[in-house]
């Protein structure tokens, strides 16, 4: 499965998950899920932890991530990048979108901005 298909799958799955939602997909399979957290960075940590719990120490390596709402700061994506995520899809809309995108780009990863939120309570 190519990165584009993985991002599409992660984005579609993200619609049905309780906010704040972060999903990790690798090889056509959901490998990590962080949801229902108060902060987006905690949801990122939860998704990475679940990936490691069920896939081993390198659980998130090579995965892509989806977020149901924008990243207000670069700390959430940094958690994902540090775990080995290669691409992130998110709706955008933060005042700091340019900063977050620049940080992801500088790390050598890709970020796709959809313009559509899945965030809900």
Please report, for each region that a protein language model flagged, where it lies by residue.
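Conserved small/polar residues in nucleotide/adenosyl-binding loops
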Residues: 1-6
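Glycine-rich, charged/polar anion/phosphate-binding loops
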Residues: 7-11
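Short, small/polar residue-rich loop motifs at catalytic or cofactor-binding pockets
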Residues: 16-19
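General beta-strand structural signal in soluble alpha/beta enzymes
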Residues: 21-25, 32-33, 67, 89-90, ...
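Glycine- and Gly-Pro-enriched alpha-helical subdomains that act as flexible
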Residues: 23, 29-77
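C-terminal binding/interaction regions
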Residues: 73, 78-121
């Amino acid at each position: 499965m190519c990165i584009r298909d993985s991002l599409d799958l992660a984005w579609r799955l993200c619609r049905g998950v309780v906010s704040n939602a972060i999903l990790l997909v690798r090889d056509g399979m959901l490998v990590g899920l962080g949801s229902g957290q108060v902060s987006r960075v905690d949801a990122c940590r939860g998704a990475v932890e679940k990936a490691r719990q069920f896939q081993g120490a390198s659980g998130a390596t090579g995965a892509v991530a989806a977020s149901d709402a924008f990243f207000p700061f670069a700390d959430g994506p940094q958690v994902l990048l540090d775990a080995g995520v290669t691409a992130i899809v998110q709706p955008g809309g933060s005042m700091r979108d340019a900063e977050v995108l620049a940080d992801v780009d500088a790390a050598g990863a890709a970020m796709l901005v959809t313009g559509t939120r899945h965030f809900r309570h």
